[in-house]
Amino acid sequence: MSLEVTDLTVDIGERRVVDGVSFGVPDGARVGLIGESGSGKSLTALAILGLLPDGAEAGGSVRWNGRELIGLPDRELATLRGDEIGIVFQEPRTALNPIRTIGRQIGESVRIHEGVSRGEARRRAVTEAARVALPDPGRIVARYPHQLSGGQRQRAAIAMALACRPRLLIADEPTTALDVTIQSEILELLLSLVEDDGMSLVFITHDLAVLSQIATHGVVLDEGRVVETAPVSTLLTAPASDVTRGLLRDATATLWRPEGLA
């Protein structure tokens, strides 16, 4: 199992905001963490990545290919991020530096983790921009984040996250800030890239309809605890918890299941 989370806790001061969360992500699996705002899903992801805010402390176990990540030194975690584990945030401005070109930022990830030359990094940046369907990739890599649309910025952030071909992608509500049409395009892009590269995926969302488009299994959280774990098809047709039933009622996007989704 590539990622195994066991009894994960997150404490902020005396308050426990993630309480005993456990789930696994086998190689190549697509697993969704779903819950309302404040359910602990994003903090769970940040704990896995070693990116918790100041004052928050993680406990329990997070094992990546058998290696324990809880308590791992920051330098070693930073090496894993971007190399073995890619990250896409809800708001691409979180990932993109406003005073650096898109190409420099995509290429910088490759230079840091693979040690390539500046010329090779720029070539790779153009390749990755094309891979995420950014228009006119040879020119767009010379632009700054503010010169791109919201959907284009998210594509650029995805290109950065996947430039080094990580084995696991963690995507934290990457489509929430986008309109419905662009949201669908980004979901289809992510699904295609994950399948093409054989990556594992942890996808975080509050929308069961969105989850149904990209994940095969779901972990439902409420108040920091797991209340249900099941295939997404089961969550949609036979939810076992009141929380999941509420998420199903609240789903507003069109439910669509790609061919072959189990």
Descriptions of predicted regions:
Residues 184-197, 209:
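Helical segment within the ABC ATPase nucleotide-binding domain
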Residues 163-167:
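A short, proline-enriched helix->beta-strand linker immediately N-terminal to the Walker B motif
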Residues 229-230:
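ABC ATPase "signature
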Residues 143-148, 152:
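Conserved ABC ATPase signature
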